[in-house]
UniProtKB/Swiss-Prot annotation:
Cofactor(s) recorded in Swiss-Prot or TrEMBL: [4Fe-4S] cluster
NCBIfam families: ispH_lytB, PRK13371.1
Catalyzed reaction equations: isopentenyl diphosphate + 2 oxidized [2Fe-2S]-[ferredoxin] + H2O = (2E)-4-hydroxy-3-methylbut-2-enyl diphosphate + 2 reduced [2Fe-2S]-[ferredoxin] + 2 H(+); dimethylallyl diphosphate + 2 oxidized [2Fe-2S]-[ferredoxin] + H2O = (2E)-4-hydroxy-3-methylbut-2-enyl diphosphate + 2 reduced [2Fe-2S]-[ferredoxin] + 2 H(+)
Positions bound to (2E)-4-hydroxy-3-methylbut-2-enyl diphosphate: 86, 179, 244, 311-313, 374
Name by which UniProt lists this protein: 4-hydroxy-3-methylbut-2-enyl diphosphate reductase
Tree of life domain: Bacteria
Ligand binding (dimethylallyl diphosphate): 86, 179, 311-313, 374
Annotated source species: Gloeobacter violaceus (strain ATCC 29082 / PCC 7421)
Length: 417
C-alpha cells in the first residue's frame, strides 16, 4: 500500500516507550534463569526453562509499534482490527491505553468487525497477523491513518502466495482456515485451499491421484477453499505455503507429500510445471519448537506451556510434549495454578478449559516450562514463582507449610475455540 497515511515502520519513539515495555513485560527472574543455564533450583524444586521461548522479535516489534502509535497520535481515537497478538495481558494493556478493538462492542463482547465506526481522523493499527486485502481496501477508502505491525515473516508468505498466483498455481496453505493470519494470507490468492494437517493433505493428494466424489470433497473443504473452488481444475498446479506458526515438521511432510503426488501424477520431467514450494516457517517458531524438542529430552516430572488459548504456536508446543508422553498443561497465566492439588488448563483435544487434580507431585520435582511467541517474560516469571509458592519454597530456597489460596473457582469452562 502506498499512501501518506500508511506506516509500516515505527515512529522513532522506541526509546520513549522502552521503560513502559520493560515495566509491563520483562522480568528480573527470567534474566536470572537465563544467566544460570536456563535452570533454577530452590529447595526440592527444579525449573528447567526452554532455551527459546516467549516474545519473538516480530511480536516485540508489533507491541512496540502499538505503544509508539499511542504516543505519536495522543488525543486521537485509536483502533485495532483484532488482537495484536494472542496474549490476554498484552491486549488488556492496549484496552487500558484507550485503544479500541473493531471486533468488540462497548462492553467488550466479541462482535463482527464494524468499520463504520472508523472516521477519517482515526488511527487504525493492523496486528502482527496482518489484515485481509478486503480490510485494507476499506481502511484505505476511509483515508484514516494505518499503522501496519504485520510480522515480516507473514509478509514473506504473502509474497510467496503472490508468486504462485502470478504463475496461475493454486496455493495450498497449511494452517487453520479461521486463524487471522491464514485469512489474511488466503485473501492474497485468487485460488487457494487450506489444509489443517497431514491427514487432510493426504485426502487432497488422493483426489489428485485417483479422483473421487467432487461433492463430498467440497463438503469437507468448502469453508477452507476459495469461492468457486473446483478440485478437478484447481489441483493441477499447486504451490505450498503455510501459517507461520504451524509445526515445522508437519509443514515439511505436507510439502514432500504434494511433491511426490505431483511427480506420480505428471512425471518427474513435468514436476516444475505442477508443483512449487518454499520454506515459510518463521525462524522464531522453529527455534521455539527445536528448544521444546530439546527440553522434553530432560528428566521432567511435568511440563507447563504458557500462552493464550487461541495461540496456534503455543498449542503446537504442547503437542510436542503430549507426543512424548509427558504430563503437560497449557495455561494462560499464573492464576490457573489454583493450588498444589488443582490446575485449570486448556485440554489439547477438547479445546476446552478443564480442571485436573493432583497435577503437582509431592516431594522433589522437576518442572519444564516454555511459552509461546506471544507470552511476555513477566507472565512466565509469575508462573514460575507460583510453582515455588505452591511447593512451599521461598526465594531463599527455604521450605515451609503454606496455604493454597484458590485463585479461580471455576470447575470447568466453555469451549475456547
Amino acid at each position: 500500500m502506498q499512501s501518506k497515511n500508511y506506516f509500516r515502520k515505527g515512529f522513532g519513539l522506541k526509546a520513549e516507550v522502552q521503560d513502559d515495555l520493560k515495566a509491563e513485560y520483562e522480568s528480573s527472574l527470567i534474566h536470572e534463569i537465563r544467566a544460570n543455564g536456563y535452570t533454577l533450583r530452590r529447595g526440592g524444586v527444579t525449573v528447567r526453562l526452554a532455551e527459546a521461548f516467549g516474545f519473538c522479535w516480530g511480536v516485540d516489534k508489533a507491541v512496540s509499534m502499538a505503544y509508539e502509535t499511542h504516543r505519536m497520535f495522543a488525543g486521537r481515537q485509536l483502533w485495532i482490527t483484532n488482537e495484536i497478538i494472542h496474549n490476554p495481558l498484552v491486549n488488556q494493556h492496549l484496552r487500558a491505553m484507550g485503544i479500541r478493538f473493531l471486533d468488540e462492542d462497548e462492553s467488550g463482547r466479541r462482535v463482527p468487525k464494524d468499520f463504520e465506526r472508523v472516521s477519517e481522523k482515526d488511527v487504525v493499527i493492523l496486528p502482527a497477523f496482518g489484515a485481509s486485502t478486503q480490510e485494507m481496501q476499506i481502511l484505505d477508502e476511509k483515508n484514516c491513518v494505518i499503522v501496519d505491525t504485520t510480522c515480516p515473516w507473514v509478509s514473506a508468505v504473502w509474497n510467496r502466495v503472490g508468486k504462485y498466483d502470478r504463475a496461475e498455481f493454486t496455493s495450498i496453505i497449511h494452517g487453520k482456515y479461521q486463524h487471522e493470519e491464514t485469512v489474511a494470507t488466503a485473501s492474497r490468492a485468487r485460488r487457494y485451499l487450506v489444509v489443517l494437517n497431514l491427514e487432510e493433505a493426504q485426502q487432497v493428494c488422493d483426489y489428485i491421484l485417483h479422483g473421487g466424489d467432487r461433492r463430498a470433497f467440497l463438503a469437507h473443504f468448502g469453508m477452507a477453499a476459495c469461492e468457486g473452488f473446483d478440485p478437478d481444475r484447481d489441483l493441477v498446479r499447486v504451490g505450498i505455503a503455510n501459517q507461520t506458526t504451524m509445526l515445522k515438521g508437519e509443514t515439511e511432510r505436507i510439502g514432500k507429500l504434494f511433491e511426490r503426488t505431483m511427480m506420480r501424477r505428471y512425471g518427474p520431467a513435468n514436476l516444475a510445471d505442477h508443483f512449487m514450494s518454499h520454506d515459510t516457517i518463521c525462524d522464531a517458531t522453529q527455534e521455539r519448537q527445536d528448544a521444546m524438542f530439546k527440553l522434553v529430552e530432560e528428566p521432567l516430572d511435568l511440563l507447563v506451556v504458557i500462552g493464550g488459548y487461541n495461540s496456534s504456536n503455543t498449542t503446537h508446543l504442547q503437542e510436542i510434549a503430549v507426543e512424548r508422553g509427558l504430563p503437560s498443561f497449557h495455561i494462560d497465566g499464573a492464576d490457573r495454578l489454583v493450588s498444589a492439588q488443582f490446575i485449570e488448563h486448556r485440554d489439547l483435544h477438547s479445546k476446552s478449559l478443564v480442571r485436573t487434580k493432583n497435577w503437582l507431585p509431592a516431594g522433589e520435582v522437576t518442572v519444564g516450562v516454555t511459552a509461546g511467541a506471544s507470552t511476555p517474560d513477566r507472565v512466565v516469571a509469575e508462573v514460575i514463582a507460583r510453582i515455588f509458592e505452591l511447593k512451599g519454597v521461598g526465594e531463599s530456597g527455604a521450605t515451609g507449610a503454606i496455604s493454597s489460596p484458590v485463585l479461580s473457582s471455576a470447575e470447568g469452562g466453555p469451549s475456547l475455540s
